[in-house]
Amino acid sequence: FLKELKEYKKKLDEDPENTVDLFEFNTNRILYTGTTSSAYKVYVEEGVDIEKSTNNLNSQIQEAFDFSGLKDDISDPSNDSTNIKTTIRLMQPYGLAYAYVDHVGIQRDYETSMLKTDKSSLGSVLWATVHEVGHQMDIDARAWPEITNNMWANNAHIKQGFDDRVNYTYIYKYLAPEKSLRGFEEMDYFQKLGMFWQLQLKKDTYWAELESLYRKRKPSPNNYQQKKDILATYSSEVLNINLTYYFEKYGFDLSDECKEKLKKYPTSNEKLWYLNSSVMNYEGQGFDNVDTNLDVTLSKSKSNIKLTMNINKSIKNDLLGYEIIKDGKVIGFTTESSYTDNEANDNSKYEVVPYAKNLTTGRNVEISSSTPNISLQQEKVTLKIGEDFNAKDYVKGFTYFGDDITSKIEVDSNVNTNECGTYTVKYTLTNENTTKQKSMEVEVVSDYDYLSDFSWESIKTDWGTPRKNGNIQGMT
């Protein structure tokens, strides 16, 4: 092929008026039409492997077919994709890409990146290409234009290592509170996409099964309400859950008749609107019967209250995020290690609930706006046998305004530095009739060599220098 490409490019250069600048390739999923000039630049001048290039584009479309539940199987006409191809053509000098009935059109500046295989080039064209293919694959009875077609684009983007385009920050902002702050029709495209995508996160075959139901049953809704009801009905069937509560959380209203029909499915209290793409391929056990060792500290300013969360590092890969409850009502959800309440008052009580990626929850921690803070220099200290140890050297105490009240900390310690072993130091701080407790582990080892063999791990301290022991072999 390269020999023919070089010869044709030479002919094109010598006689451009009578030679068509045309290049095509055909795979089992794509009929691609572009220019000889771009093909020459990519395959000859830049040395991109032709087979890798064509396979790359073909695999994007094949993955879209797979995501839709399509397969080459003539015995299953509703889901058969035998001999079905996507036509992609160079069609316009401006814009980026578009979808029409029988083809996806791209522009000239877009073309070379389509043929390249490096990650940067792929990232520059992948979303737009699969977005347009999604328009072609969208089923009218189920399509929300510029939203549902992005199910294919988002899937492709994530699978290729690019970002998830769902705007979870605003989904949490609008939906986490007891009463949703915004409904589906008021959301932007990428927030609306979340309503569909989070069901895919709940069950990774959701979209394929949903598409199959639409192809098989061929519904024809008479109005927008029927369209919404059909989506809720089919989605509930696929997940085997009465999803009334989920769609209503999104402000995606269902008819009374639809709600009644959905009562035949099992109910659920899972907060699916907390899911994000970090749960994909998660196989952990979550937080059932697990001590997350969640610690919450509170700091207060004149205008807000900031909650800072810390969890057992051994289960951080299981963590989805934290639900924030204020005075008995949910006010937010965050995947960050802190949350700021900008509508705080002096008498508020907070609860923080850790959520695992399978939506199981750990023990909640309660804290009030008057709770003092205990700041440990580190969670674990290692000492040599016989070494001096003062438990108060590793802790400080503060009011919720940040005033130092370390002198009020009470220490309960069973540490015996004359005997090897693992010990616990418990710190208790009471201020304004509110008590806070924290613990630190102390390990006493036998000699210098044993201690020097300990491997350092990344450690965070609020103050001071983390240490195994300040007196042994220069370790500080």
List PLM regions with ranges:
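Serine/threonine-rich, repeat-prone extracellular segments and beta-strand-based repeat modules
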Residues: 401-442
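Solvent-exposed, low-complexity, repeat-rich "mucin-like" stalks and linkers
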Residues: 372-403
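Pro/Thr/Ser/Gly-rich low-complexity, intrinsically disordered linker/stalk tracts
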Residues: 283-318, 359-371, 395
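Beta-strand-rich modules
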Residues: 341-359
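C-terminal edge beta-strand
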Residues: 365, 369-372, 436-446
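Catalytic cores of extracellular degradative/oxidative enzymes
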Residues: 8-216, 221, 231-232
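Extracellular carbohydrate-recognition regions
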Residues: 446-473
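Pan-zinc metallopeptidase signature
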Residues: 202-291
